[in-house]
Amino acid sequence: MGRKEEDDCSSWKKQTTNIRKTFIFMEVLGSGAFSEVFLVKQRLTGKLFALKCIKKSPAFRDSSLENEIAVLKKIKHENIVTLEDIYESTTHYYLVMQLVSGGELFDRILERGVYTEKDASLVIQQVLSAVKYLHENGIVHRDLKPENLLYLTPEENSKIMITDFGLSKMEQNGIMSTACGTPGYVAPEVLAQKPYSKAVDCWSIGVITYILLCGYPPFYEETESKLFEKIKEGYYEFESPFWDDISESAKDFICHLLEKDPNERYTCEKALSHPWIDGNTALHRDIYPSVSLQIQKNFAKSKWRQAFNAAAVVHHMRKLHMNLHSPGVRPEVENRPPETQASETSRPSSPEITITEAPVLDHSVALPALTQLPCQHGRRPTAPGGRSLNCLVNGSLHISSSLVPMHQGSLAAGPCGCCSSCLNIGSKGKSSYCSEPTLLKKANKKQNFKSEVMVPVKASGSSHCRAGQTGVCLIM
């Protein structure tokens, strides 16, 4: 059976000796241990895509890549990023992905100016619909988090898209046991090292919903071990004043998703039929001031985001549109992406990031203290909780960078036509497959499983922030 799937995957790949004959490379979108992501334009059609270039290496097996391809090939949903095509050369695999340029979920909230429960409900409804589709096809995402939820376009009514299927898994007999995911979003049964099922995705959606309604996570602690214990206990609470303006229906919805017992936890189907999603109980009261402030304080960008983000693609597409309508403009140009500010506020997320500096805490609005109050729904909840781009010189692509696709006949291009770095394929000596998102989010060169994030800590009767340790479970 495994051999048949492998042969099927091989037959689906298109062979190429020079990928640049098919695509014009326009921007660097991201880079990781084994892959680089570019904004490209297909020469034949003029369409824009995100091209994920994955090095072949003797130090790394293709099984994880084949798994990601198998998952992406199998799914077709309006709220899930699409794998358009696959190419293969002697040195690389190339995944041609649907380009998602609308920016990230938190950024869109901060830009709105007005934000309500109903807005959050519409987002979660799309996520539930997509995850329900995955589950019906025997696929568990296993790494749902706000950073993997991006808007398709910059338009106000844009759809939400689920991205990054590097940790996704096709269920066998409905049960899995390999620990993986992101701290803060991982279900209790995963941390308890028990066999688990698709219910882990529903728990993650519950955490995301909680954050969307208050701006901080339901589980936070000073250390990794304490954080994991809190999650395994399944305790959280809806603190005042942060939850005073939130409906009882929203709280009930969250309680059903953050159910410690996976057998009692809402499925996507049940969640979609809840009045907060399918009815009219989601309030239209503006909660933007409180939520936006907490998001900025607890999920700021520079802790996780790479220099190239969704704004870079939007900027490039607009510039490209103007250039193509100007006389005497060459089709293949070297564009200047927007420069990022080193002082930009930052948000914790990926365990691949190390935070060196903590932002100054605004004591005027502190995070809720770690108090223990009984949940009104019958559950006993708890308290909520840079890489510099050497390829950039003055905001433009540096010609000597290994991330820059070389023109034919210029300098030392690799045999694939993608980049010169493929000449040193096995130099990193890594043995794990790092699945970087095909979209515009953080993807470090080094695969670390520790990070420092800002967590609220109870001390001297008040909440304050301190650098704490969180971790992520190993990739399958």
Curated annotation (Swiss-Prot):
Specify the domain of life of the species encoding this protein.
Eukaryota
Q: Which one GO biological process term can you cite for this protein?
A: signal transduction
- Subcellular localization, per the record? Cytoplasm; Golgi apparatus membrane; Cell membrane
Pfam (any one): Pkinase
Gene Ontology annotations for the cellular component aspect, listed alphabetically: calcium- and calmodulin-dependent protein kinase complex; cytoplasm; Golgi membrane; plasma membrane
Ranges of residues in domain Protein kinase: 23-277
Q: Which residues bind ATP?
A: L29, G30, S31, G32, A33, F34, S35, E36, V37, K52
Region Autoinhibitory domain, as annotated, extends over 277-317
Ranges annotated as biased composition (Polar residues): 338-352
UniProt-annotated stretches for the region Disordered:
325-352
Q: Which UniProt keywords apply?
A: Allosteric enzyme, ATP-binding, Calmodulin-binding, Cell membrane, Cytoplasm, Golgi apparatus, Kinase, Lipoprotein, Membrane, Nucleotide-binding, Prenylation, Serine/threonine-protein kinase, Transferase
Q: How does it sit in the membrane?
A: Peripheral membrane protein
Entries under SUPFAM superfamilies matching the protein:
Protein kinase-like (PK-like)
Q: Where is the active site?
A: D143
| PANTHER family in UniProt | SERINE/THREONINE-PROTEIN KINASE
For domains, the record's comment is: The autoinhibitory domain overlaps with the calmodulin binding region and interacts in the inactive folded state with the catalytic domain as a pseudosubstrate.
Family per record: Belongs to the protein kinase superfamily. CAMK Ser/Thr protein kinase family. CaMK subfamily.
Q: What is this protein called?
A: Calcium/calmodulin-dependent protein kinase type 1G
Q: Which organism is it from?
A: Homo sapiens
What high-level taxonomic lineage is stated for the organism? Eukaryota, Metazoa, Chordata, Craniata, Vertebrata
